[in-house]
A protein has these predicted regions:
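Bacterial N-terminal signal peptides that target proteins for export
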Residues: 1-12
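Sec/Tat signal peptide C-region and signal peptidase I cleavage site
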Residues: 17-26
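Mature soluble domains of exported/periplasmic/lumenal proteins and thiol-rich metal-chelating peptides
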Residues: 28, 60, 131-133, 161, ...
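Short beta-strand edge/turn micro-motifs at domain boundaries
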Residues: 150-178
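Low-complexity, intrinsically disordered terminal/linker segments enriched in charged
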Residues: 168-221
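Short, hydrophobic secondary-structure boundary micro-motifs
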Residues: 53-54, 123, 196-197
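Early exported N-terminus immediately downstream of N-terminal targeting peptides
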Residues: 27-107, 111
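Surface-exposed, charged secondary-structure patches
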Residues: 109-151, 203-221
């Protein structure tokens, strides 16, 4: 049940942070950005026959969508360092770069699966509770699907010189970053930082070819 709720919520998480090129010309308010882009991306998914058909072509299209529209709007360094937690300080510069790359690849897989699984969920966009001068806000969305309880998504976002960036996503109150931190702590305890990197590489290499063949896009500062 929890896995199903996470999948439903991740659909909205993936869609809401995919920013179209036109939106990048100006800094849009975070709640407006989430609403506008969620509706636009969902409309694309509904109308794309290749995506609706599923299979390898759909997966490749999802990867391209994620790399061009979603990845640039994450603050991956903040997400990775927070997910690795206290062990981040144990990593050297090369290890930090590799951790960042593997974590991006892991999220590509997560969002590819979620977007492919989209099936007419509805979205309730909650009013933003923040001051105009705030540079760190939380945008709230509820995902609604017939026959299930609504799932709440909280996007923790920070204002950067190039616009608003997501640094954590909380699904039904569960932090994506904190959830990975627990797993990563165990891996570092058992095999050190290199053990964590190897575990991430193994997990990412197990992806099907459509997802593994395309590397994660570079982080946009």
């Amino acid at each position: 049940m929890l896995r199903r709720l996470v999948r439903l919520a991740t659909v909205a998480a993936a869609a809401a942070i995919a920013v179209p090129a036109l939106a990048q010309a100006e800094v849009m308010a975070p709640d407006v950005l989430v609403k506008n882009v969620t509706l636009e991306v969902v409309d694309i998914i509904r109308k794309d026959q290749d995506i609706q058909a599923g299979g390898a072509v759909a997966k490749k299209k999802m990867v391209a969508l994620i790399e061009t529209k979603i990845l640039p709007h994450f603050n991956f360094q903040a997400m990775t360092s927070s997910a690795v937690g206290r062990n981040w300080g144990k990593a050297n510069a090369e290890q930090k770069t590799r951790l960042n790359e593997e974590f991006k690849t892991l999220l590509v897989r997560t969002y590819s699966s979620a977007l492919t699984a989209y099936s007419d969920q509805k979205f309730d966009f909650r009013p933003l509770r923040a001051k105009p001068t705030d540079t760190d806000v939380t945008v709230n969305v509820r995902v609604i699907q017939s026959g299930t309880q609504p799932v709440t998504i909280d996007y923790d976002m920070e204002k950067r010189p190039s616009g608003w960036k997501v640094w954590d996503v909380r699904i039904a109150g569960v932090s994506l970053v904190a959830n990975y931190r627990t797993e990563f702590d165990n891996l570092v305890r058992d095999g050190g930082v290199d053990g964590l990197i190897k575990a991430l590489q193994t997990k990412n290499s197990s992806l099907d070819p459509a997802l593994a063949a395309s590397p994660a896009g570079a982080q946009k500062k």
